[in-house]
Design a protein with these regions (language model features):
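Glycine-rich phosphate-binding loop of actin/hexokinase-like ATP-binding domains
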Residues: 1-27
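Hydrophobic alpha-helical scaffolding
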Residues: 9-16, 51, 73-76, 107
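Short gly/pro-enriched beta-turn/loop segments at secondary-structure junctions
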Residues: 18, 42, 56, 95-97
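A mobile "lid/hinge" subdomain adjacent to the ATP/sugar-phosphate binding pocket shared
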Residues: 29-75
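Active-site proximal loops enriched in glycine and acidic residues that flank catalytic Cys/His/Asp
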Residues: 65, 101-106
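Internal helix-turn-beta structural module
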Residues: 71-97, 107-152
């Protein structure tokens, strides 16, 4: 997060990083004042908005995506891309990393998110051990022994 909770990756109801001009676009398109736009960006965007209002809870979206809901699947894809983009930015800023650690509810429990995020990071020489990645809520290394970057 930056100055406000909107900065960063896509979240449950928050947009994450956006083009600043989107605020004017939303205001005009939806006939909203600045408070209305901020309400949309803070409470009706993110996974909730991307999923067409289905849910802000990853567990619900994952279940829906597994059942064929394209909006839920797209919301998860945007989340993973958003995370990978931030990881890539920090890797560049730090001139490389030794490890990437997934934390919190989604990071510790969302097997498909870890898999998809790591798939974007293949250029770093990161490889995922699919069996190890199948564990939830455990503090373990989920990268392969030959991975150039450890993932936990």
């Amino acid at each position: 997060m930056g100055l406000t909770p909107l900065e960063g990756v896509v979240m449950g109801t928050r947009s994450g990083n956006i083009d600043p001009a989107i605020m004017e676009f939303i205001a005009k398109k939806e006939n909203l004042d600045i408070e209305g736009v901020m309400n949309v960006l803070n409470k009706k965007s993110g996974l909730l908005g991307l999923s067409g209002g289905l849910s802000s809870d990853f567990r619900d979206l994952n279940e829906a995506a597994e059942g064929g809901n394209e909006d839920a699947a797209n919301a998860i894809d945007v989340l993973c891309y958003s995370i990978a983009k931030f990881v890539g930015g920090y890797v560049a800023a730090m001139n490389g990393v030794d490890a990437i650690v997934f934390t919190a509810g989604i990071g510790e429990n969302a097997i498909p998110v870890r898999e998809k995020v790591v798939s974007y990071l293949g250029y770093l020489g990161v490889t995922l051990d699919k069996d190890a990645n199948g564990h939830r809520g455990e503090e373990i290394v989920i990268s392969t022994p030959d991975s150039k970057v450890k993932v936990a």
